[in-house]
Design a protein with these regions (language model features):
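C-terminal motif of bacterial Sec signal peptides marking the signal peptidase cleavage site
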Residues: 15-17
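His/Cys-centered metal/cofactor-coordination and adjacent catalytic loops
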Residues: 142-157
Length: 519
């Protein structure tokens, strides 16, 4: 036995010397040299960077060639649960046990969505957190909390570098896809810096150093980083057309701009490779496997809800189709890419108290995630799926298994609707606040609860009832889910700050330097 040990121990020692250590902090060599963004001294940035760096020290991080950030605007956890049941029932399957594609990703976390100044945040501050690593003031985009809302003079010295800025400087391809306006809060955070998210087509003030500000659409065209976006898809043509120009699809609708800049013409003038498309036919005709740089503005304002696309006059692609096209184009770059995909209209349907469209939009968003997973590899592409904030929709009552998620709550075997203390049935889905609390009767506001006995609550236009009346339902402030796969996804776990998502993407892709490099 001693002879055997004597012969074996040197071999084991040699094997150990040749085996990579399993110690904490063992990470593969990054693909790129990390950059130090100009907001690196911001307190929110520092705390997030240190938190993610500590996880890297424990777990290591694999390098990601590509990064895709999926944001379901307003897709809180109750929305995910209801969308799961809806998607299953829509396909004739058991809704409760159905799995959305996003739910199959191996790593999960909860994200804290508060902004610098609000417990319940808006989409501008939350998008800024995810793409720049700082929490900022609500209704501001791409600037730190040191700048003031609606005040252009306060912006200087409080600018940021987004992950997309850093990607362009490193020579990567970049893209942004949304079903909202391209200049709306979430997509706008990728390229713009403004003290007011509403300045999409013009600066809405003449005070506080207004001359120092540029509207969001103009910032998209004038974006100084690298060679600009390879693909940018969404709605919002009205912000890009010269003052007085009528929309090509709706001849009674005019441009939002107040100046003579024709931003579409400026885009096309950049190079022969710059293309512009506005409808399904143009989308179908484009070769996304080329080196074209494509701006697609498919609607005057926001794109159609997915369940309404069929009646759109000019036709427009689904979010899944836009995602496939974006990945096809971005994959032409051998150096890798960074892409944001937003399901922007989940949020809009919730604000309207319209759960049917909100859940259908979440299902369409999930199909876009499935498309991305089919086209990419978990070996080199980090995919993160999350929401920017939640909404006040709840799932309540005691509906039995298989009860239509959009229907009246029923716990009985024969399907008889359950009734509240007022003797009226109620839906499984409802809102804390919103337009569904009241209705107009003979020109007056009637806020007594409507008897839903003979109402088709599964109709796509049905507005859920709410507890107290508001013209627009409000955001929710609870934590939202984060799902992740691919290199760097191992850093997504526990309860994290929303701005840590930037650090996860930046460190995994090698675009962002470790905290020690910022000192």
């Amino acid at each position: 036995m001693r002879k055997l040990l004597a012969a074996t121990l040197p071999a084991l020692a040699l094997l150990a010397a040749c085996t990579p250590p399993a110690a904490t902090g063992d990470a593969a060599k990054p693909l790129r040299t990390g950059q130090v963004p100009q907001q690196a001294a911001d307190a929110y940035y520092v705390r997030a960077a240190e938190a993610v760096d500590a996880r890297i020290a424990q777990r290591g991080v694999k390098p990601a060639k590509n990064v895709i950030l999926f944001i379901g605007d307003g897709m809180g956890i109750s929305t995910i649960t209801a969308a799961r049941i809806y998607a299953g029932q829509k396909r004739g399957l058991d809704g409760e046990s159905y799995r959305l594609t996003m739910e199959t990703l191996p790593y999960t976390a909860l994200s804290k969505t508060y902004s610098n100044d609000f417990q319940v945040a808006d989409s501008a501050s939350t998008a800024t957190a995810m793409v720049t690593g700082v929490k900022t003031n609500s209704r501001t985009l791409g600037i730190t909390s040191g700048a003031n809302f609606d005040n252009c003079a306060s912006v200087e010295g409080h600018r940021t570098d987004s992950l997309f800025d850093l990607a362009e400087r490193a020579g990567l391809a970049t893209g942004v896809v949304t079903t909202a306006r391209l200049t709306h809060a979430t997509p706008g955070a990728t390229y713009s810096e403004t003290p007011d998210r509403d300045w999409e087509a013009y600066v809405g003030t003449e005070e506080n150093g207004a001359e120092a500000c540029e509207d969001i659409a103009a910032q998209f065209i004038d974006w100084p980083e690298g060679d600009g976006f390879e693909v940018a898809f969404g709605g919002g043509r009205a912000a890009f057309l010269k003052k007085g120009t009528m929309d090509p699809e709706y001849d009674s609708r005019e441009s939002y701009r107040r100046d003579d800049r024709d931003l579409v013409a400026e885009w096309l003038a950049k190079s022969d490779q710059h293309k512009y498309i506005t409808d399904q036919a143009g989308f179908d005709a484009e070769n996304f496997a080329s080196d074209d740089k494509v701006l697609g503005l498919f609607e005057y304002s926001h794109m159609e809800y997915d369940m309404d696309r069929a009646v759109d006059p000019a036709g427009e692609p689904s979010l899944a189709d836009l995602t496939r096209a974006a990945i096809t184009r971005l994959s032409q770059d051998p150096d890798g890419f960074v892409l944001m995909v937003e399901g922007g209209r989940i949020d809009h349907a919730h604000h309207a108290g319209n759960a049917a469209r909100a859940l259908d939009e979440a299902d369409a968003f999930d199909q876009a995630i499935a498309a991305a997973l089919e086209m990419t590899s978990a070996d080199d592409t980090l995919i993160i799926v999350t929401a920017d904030h939640s909404h006040t929709m709840t799932i309540s009552g005691y509906p039995k298994r298989g009860n239509p998620i959009l229907g009246l709550a029923s716990s009985s075997l024969d399907g008889t609707p359950d009734k509240a203390l007022d003797g009226k049935p109620y839906t499984t889905l409802g809102y804390m606040n919103g337009p569904g609390a009241c209705r107009s009767v003979d020109g007056k506001l009637d806020c007594t609860r409507l008897d839903l006995t003979n109402v088709d609550t599964t109709d796509k236009d049905f507005v859920q009832q709410s507890l107290y009346p508001m013209w627009s339902e409000a955001h929710g402030g609870e934590d939202v889910a984060v799902f992740a796969s691919g290199p760097g996804s191992e850093l997504v776990s526990g309860v994290i700050e929303e701005n840590e998502i930037f650090q996860v993407m930046g460190r995994a892709s090698g675009l962002v330097a470790a905290p020690a490099a910022t000192e």
